[in-house]
Each structure stands twice: as structure tokens, then as C-alpha cells.
Amino acid sequence: MSYHLEKLNIKFIINQALIEIKNCKNIKELELIRIYWIGKNGFFSKKNKLLNILFPYEDFIKKDMLKKAYKKIKYIYFKKKQKIKNKEIKIKIFKEKIDISLPGRDVCNGSFHPISNIIRYSEKFFCSLGFSIVHGHEVENIYYNFDALNIPENHPSRTEHDTFWINENCLLRTQTSGIQIKVMESKKPPLKIISSGKVYRNDHDKTHTPMFHQLEGLMIDECIGISIVKSILYDFCYSLLGKKIKIRFRPSYFPFTEPSAEIDIMNEDGKWIEILGCGIVHPKILHNLKIDRNKYSGMAFGIGIERLAMLYYKLSDVRPLFINNLRFLKQFK
């Protein structure tokens, strides 16, 4: 498109630019029109330069008309540009709109593992009776795991068949009872503590796993007898598993308690399942820890969390609790 200076028709120029702007369909076409008409080296820029060269002190009317035409075309250009942008935004919104009539996606909430549920409930129960929670290390030395608990050197639990040894003096703890010794060393009676955590024994079948969880309890005070042990643990079992369960309290043997007992609960198949051991803290242990055994006595118990989980969730085998099968675990939400 070319226009001679002497035949400059402002109305024709404006109309021509308006037609071109009106007919463009996208930003790319509009940008080409802008460059031609009002760009740095566009139509108006060239005409102004030519007028300044030929008539530097004259023809102010034509210069003014060109300036007004330039402003008008620029205004129309920006208006058209905004219109195209708005249209593109509407198209984009339409394409990306969400159909709110469609059902939303389910939110998959996590939940506590069955083992964690039993531990949390057990801790809550004993804390309501005034027990405090303490924690210990899973790697223990031979003194706290065996010697301090009155377990002699020739005891079967010290062999490799039952215990995972790290070296001659360290092992993976076989019970959480070692924590009781550390508490009795550092604090004076009366004491009421519980401790839960992983323990390790070299045993694996449908009711045993090499790693399992225990909740250990200790109470040191005046006049603690076996009847108190039995009463507290019966209340715990009834609270967790219901009043209709059948419980058996039978004598047993543990090196660190005297007398000792075990509690069994009957499962749905009519079989007795051992869930915990308990007893009165052996006087020798109190004496070794410089606790006056004529004034104080103590009760101790160790609960098998997996056994409780089997009874609570009606499981016949403990091993599925450790295979991380979501289809199995989701049913316990």
C-alpha cells in the first residue's frame, strides 16, 4: 500500500486502517497491521519524516491531521486487541470448565495400623491409672537385657536360637523389661511406668514373629500384691476386648518376678491364647538396685501387642499384620 504525499487523504487512510483492523481474526494478524500503520517504521512515521524534510516550517494542518489520525488508529487497535484477548480467554475458560454435576474423586484418608491402634489404646488405659510413658533403645547391652533381670548365664534365652546378637555385649532387646531397671536406677519409689516398643526373638510361626511389640509395665510402692496385678490386668482385658471374654490366670515362671503368672484369653475357636506375663518383682532385683524390699514391693507385666491384635480383630494368623498388604489393612479403618 502506498500513498503520495500530495494526494494525502486522511479520511481514506483512517477508513482503510479500520477495515483492516476490523477484518483481522487473531493477535498475530493484528500485530502485522500495527507494524504497518503505527509501528516505529510504519506508515505514519514515514509520512511525518517526509513532511518534516519537505516542509519543515509549513503545512501544519496536514501534520496535525496525521497526528489525529495516528491517535485514532492506535486507539482502535488497542480496543480490537482487548476484544480479541477477551474472546480467547472466554474460549479457554469454556474448554477448561469443570462439570460440577460429575461425582468428585474419593479422598483416600490414611489410618493407624492395627498394631498402633492397640498400643495407643493400651497407653491411654494405663495413663488413666496414673502410669507414665517412658521409652528405651532397641539395641541393648547384656546387663540390662539379662543380668539385671536375674537371668543367669546358662539360661536358654541367651543362646543364638532365641536371641539376635550384635556382638558379645550387645543384642537386639528380647523384652522391654530393661527399661524398668534403668528407671529404678534413676528414680526413687513410688513408681508407675509403662513402655512400649519393638522387641526381637528368633522365632517365626503363625503366633510368633522375629520382631514384635511389647508393652511393659512396672509399679513400685508399699503393699503391692498379686491381687493388685490381677485386678489391673483383668480390667485392661475387659476394657479392650469386652466383658464376655473368658480369661485364665495361671501360675508361671519368670526369673525377674516371684510369684509369676500368665494370662490367657480364649479365642473364637475355643483355644487359649497367651497374651501377657506378670508377677511381683523379684526381691533380689530390688535389693540389687538398693530399694528397701522390706518397705517396697512391685508388680511388673509384659503384654504381647500382636496377640491382643489377633483377639481384637479376630485374626487366626499374626503374620499378615507385617506384609503391608493394603487390601488387608484397609478393612481395619
Curated annotation (Swiss-Prot):
Keyword Phosphoprotein in record: no
Pfam families according to UniProt: tRNA-synt_2d
Names of the cofactor(s): Mg(2+)
Binding residue positions for Mg(2+): E258
Signal peptide start and end residues: none
Entry's cofactor comment: Binds 2 magnesium ions per tetramer.
Keywords of the record: Aminoacyl-tRNA synthetase, ATP-binding, Cytoplasm, Ligase, Magnesium, Metal-binding, Nucleotide-binding, Protein biosynthesis
EC numbers on record: 6.1.1.20
Principal location class: cytoplasm
Location of the protein in the cell: Cytoplasm
Gene Ontology terms: cellular component: cytoplasm
Reaction(s) this enzyme catalyzes, per UniProt: tRNA(Phe) + L-phenylalanine + ATP = L-phenylalanyl-tRNA(Phe) + AMP + diphosphate + H(+)
Enzyme class name: ligase
Domain of life from the UniProt record: Bacteria
Gene Ontology biological process: phenylalanyl-tRNA aminoacylation
GO molecular function, one term: ATP binding
Family affiliation: Belongs to the class-II aminoacyl-tRNA synthetase family. Phe-tRNA synthetase alpha subunit type 1 subfamily.
Subunit structure comment from the entry: Tetramer of two alpha and two beta subunits.
Name of the protein: Phenylalanine--tRNA ligase alpha subunit
Organism expressing this protein natively: Wigglesworthia glossinidia brevipalpis
